[in-house]
UniProtKB/Swiss-Prot annotation:
UniProt-recorded Gene Ontology molecular function terms: nickel cation binding; urease activity
Cellular component GO terms held in the UniProt record: cytoplasm
NCBIfam families documented for this protein: PRK13241.1 (NF009712), urease_gam (TIGR00193)
Group of enzyme by EC: hydrolase
Keywords, sorted A to Z: Cytoplasm, Hydrolase
Pathway given in the UniProt record: Nitrogen metabolism; urea degradation; CO(2) and NH(3) from urea (urease route): step 1/1
GO biological process, one term: urea catabolic process
Pfam assignment, any one: Urease_gamma
Top-level taxon in the UniProt lineage: Bacteria
Catalytic reaction equation(s): urea + 2 H2O + H(+) = hydrogencarbonate + 2 NH4(+)
The protein, known as: Urease subunit gamma
Length: 100
């Protein structure tokens, strides 16, 4: 299977997000890379599902809380930028303060 660098990045994000999802389901607090992957994958899927940019941006602030992540992680993530594929093309989505 031949994948472009972008496709490889998406696959890596998905794999890390799946691991984060499983750890969260077991009651573990997510670390920085897990939180980033979890939110990023969810944003990419929401865009793929046909949500608008505004809906995806809002959705990004509802995925994790401070109780879901290790201490200090929310302060390490002031914003997340994701290049997501929407039905009308690829757009850059920025979520400010994704972990309120």
């Amino acid at each position: 299977m031949k994948l472009t660098p972008r496709e490889k990045d998406k696959l890596l994000i998905f794999t890390a997000a799946l691991l984060a999802e499983r750890r969260r389901a077991r009651g573990l607090k997510l670390n920085y890379p897990e939180a980033i992957a979890f939110i990023t994958a969810a944003l990419m899927e929401a865009a793929r599902d046909g949500k608008t940019v505004a809906e995806v941006m809002h959705y990004g602030t509802t995925l994790l809380t401070r109780d879901d992540v290790m201490e200090g992680v929310p302060e390490m993530i002031p914003d997340i930028q994701v290049e997501a594929t929407f039905p009308d093309g690829t757009k850059l989505v920025t979520v400010h303060h994704p972990i309120p």
